[in-house]
């Protein structure tokens, strides 16, 4: 499917509400087993208002068609308030917008989809990210900001093509951006009981498994 501007507008307005409901101001801890040395490590991913525009592949423009920079918060609020006009945006000229729009709805279920994470291998000319997470049909590119990662690009692509060392995700937990401890378990690898695995002390200090119940295979 090739998106028209009307299609794009409809999709980004709809997905903005889903983003607000499912991901906005949430923080995820991705606990994984490093493929190269078998060590258990983690990354944290946070979702802000300002990250949403990057995921759409759209650019805000002025009345003369000039791209407006540093308007990501404005873009998101226009989407939430259904105030994004067709003349207010354009598709990026590098051709990535169609790919991003196709992947955007899938992103909202990122915690259900993610089975693998790894360092990005720079195989795509227009994808500038540090890490990737996802599965066989979807990949979320992550950019590092200080000690956490933020979402910057989503693609309908097998993650194993985008990382040279795909590492198994053991668990994903979620918390509010201002909450101290991760206590909501969103995903656990099939057959894994988190109560029976020895996690590094650093990770143990960040999570609370009091409400976790092993569901079996």
Regions found by a protein language model. Name each.
Residues 135-190:
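Compact beta-sheet-dominated globular domain cores
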Residues 1-126, 130, 174-217:
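An acidic, glycine-rich, mixed-charge low-complexity segment common to nucleic-acid enzymes
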């Amino acid at each position: 499917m090739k998106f028209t501007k009307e299609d794009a507008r409809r999709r980004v307005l709809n997905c903005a509400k889903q983003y607000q409901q499912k991901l906005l101001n949430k923080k995820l801890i991705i606990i994984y087993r490093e493929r190269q040395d078998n060590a258990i490590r983690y990354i944290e991913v946070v979702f802000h208002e300002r990250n949403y525009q990057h995921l759409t592949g759209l650019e805000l423009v002025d009345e003369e068609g000039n791209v407006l920079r540093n308007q990501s918060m404005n873009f998101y609020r226009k989407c939430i308030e259904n105030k994004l006009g067709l003349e207010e945006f354009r598709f990026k000229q590098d051709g990535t917008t169609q790919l991003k729009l196709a992947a955007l709805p899938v992103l909202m279920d990122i915690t259900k989809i993610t089975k693998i994470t790894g360092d990005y291998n720079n195989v795509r000319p227009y994808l500038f990210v540090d890490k990737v997470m996802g599965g066989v049909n979807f990949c979320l590119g992550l950019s590092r900001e200080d000690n956490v990662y933020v979402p910057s690009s989503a693609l309908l692509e097998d993650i194993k093509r985008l990382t040279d060392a795909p590492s198994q995700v053991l668990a994903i937990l979620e918390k509010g951006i201002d909450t101290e401890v991760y206590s909501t378990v969103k995903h656990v690898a099939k057959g894994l009981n988190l109560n029976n695995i020895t996690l590094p002390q650093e990770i143990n200090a960040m999570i609370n498994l009091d409400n976790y119940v092993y569901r079996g295979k």
